[in-house]
């Protein structure tokens, strides 16, 4: 596990270690805890693990997903974390959730509008959004994080794609890159949805990226490197 400080540029520093070596997991957080979910340490598993963001150290076991999967999308409100879609090894429509400041197994939340993996999640304090995904739809689902239920289709990406990175400032969500290598960045307002609009281009086409943000800017980390972008505008 590495970390960076948003207000300064520079290389990532060592934070600690996951419970085991793994790939194709996802993660989300509130201001205190980060939770990493699923993945593949040799076979697809259901492990959830957490860290306390303010202090470096190794991850601790949190509990288990309702269904073992990888390539899922995680998002959160200040109190609840949701995990959407993934591969089981077939594409999954499962949504499950946890309460971030407790530990324990995930609980069923509902279903996406279609089974898919490698979508791009973003969230506000009330809504989680899952955009795109494999096998290649452009549709964008949302859920209301505080109440269980199925995903609702409320818009489309400007270009159908998957395996990009999502980041947000709790008002606007941005979606950057995709498989196969793309430099597309588009955005939408989380509260209203609709068709995503062009935001700008990445410095290089990249895929399998992950995005993070504070309230001012975001970082998109993919196969071709890391680039900051100001979420509130375009660029």
Language-model features, listed with the residues they occupy:
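Polar, enzyme-active/binding microenvironments
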Residues: 1-235
């Amino acid at each position: 596990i590495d970390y960076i400080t948003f207000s300064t540029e520079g290389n990532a520093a060592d934070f600690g270690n996951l419970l085991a070596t793994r790939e194709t997991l996802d993660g989300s957080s509130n201001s205190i805890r980060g939770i990493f979910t699923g993945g593949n340490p040799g076979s697809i598993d259901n492990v959830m693990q957490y860290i306390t963001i303010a202090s470096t150290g190794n991850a601790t076991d949190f509990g288990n997903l309702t269904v073992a999967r990888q390539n899922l999308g995680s998002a959160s409100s200040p109190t609840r974390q949701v995990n959407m879609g993934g591969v089981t090894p077939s594409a999954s429509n499962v949504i499950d959730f946890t309460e971030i400041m407790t530990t324990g197994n995930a609980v069923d939340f509902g279903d996406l509008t279609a089974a898919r993996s490698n979508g791009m999640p973003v969230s506000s304090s009330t809504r989680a959004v899952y955009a795109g995904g494999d096998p290649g739809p452009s549709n964008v689902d949302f859920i209301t994080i505080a109440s269980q239920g199925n995903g609702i289709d409320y818009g489309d990406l400007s270009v159908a794609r998957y395996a990009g990175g999502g980041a947000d400032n709790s008002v606007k969500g941005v979606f950057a890159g995709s498989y196969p290598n793309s430099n597309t960045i588009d955005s939408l307002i989380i509260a209203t949805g609709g068709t995503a609009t062009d935001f700008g281009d990445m410095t290089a086409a990249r895929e399998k990226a992950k995005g993070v943000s504070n309230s001012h800017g975001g970082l998109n980390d993919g196969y071709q490197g890391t680039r900051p972008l100001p979420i509130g505008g375009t660029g």
